[in-house]
Amino acid sequence: REIFEAYLDLDDEVLAIVVFSGSKTFSLYGFRVGAQIGLSKSQEIIDNFLRVGDYSVRARFSSVSQPGMNVIGKIFTNPEYKQRFLDELHIGTSLLKARASLFLQEAEKHDLQILPYCGGFFISVPTKNKNIFKDLVEDHVYVIPMQDIIRIAISSLCMDEIPELVRKIKKHI
């Protein structure tokens, strides 16, 4: 919560927007759960933000799903559910960090260049190989191809598969 204290020093004409996606945090994939919070010292700016948000957010993203919001509401109003959620979140976060750490160690060991990784579900690897997706599929590796990079979903990997995966990617990069 301390981070929000920085917003107290904003100029009167500034609108800061804080966004949050609950879909991944709460493992509610596909539920479109999240928030967009406008912060300003000006009531007029906040009123405009609310009015524009009502139309633009609904036009782009539909509306927040009621079941998803109900689940989150139950988690945070029940101390037992909240603690269980926090315990599970810690386990998941620790596992994701361990997978990322191992991938990064293996990438360094095999001189596999990656884009800076600061956390999250994906690690991105630059490539000049225009056939990288096809080459990796032939080696039974499935990644997300993008322009000049591939994204590896480390959230879906078993720890013991990571060293071999890095070697296969390095072979085709």
Say what each PLM segment does.
Residues 1-5, 16:
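Conserved PLP phosphate-binding loop immediately N-terminal to the Schiff-base lysine helix
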Residues 9-93:
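Conserved core segment of the aminotransferase class I/II
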Residues 12, 130-173:
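PLP-dependent enzyme catalytic core of the Aspartate aminotransferase-like
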Residues 19, 113-118, 143-146:
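Short beta-strand
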Residues 23-25, 41, 121, 148-150, ...:
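Short, solvent-exposed loop/turn segments at secondary-structure junctions
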Residues 64, 95, 99, 161:
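Soluble or luminal CAZymes and related metallo-dependent hydrolases
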Residues 85-137, 156:
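Conserved PLP-binding catalytic core of the aspartate aminotransferase-like
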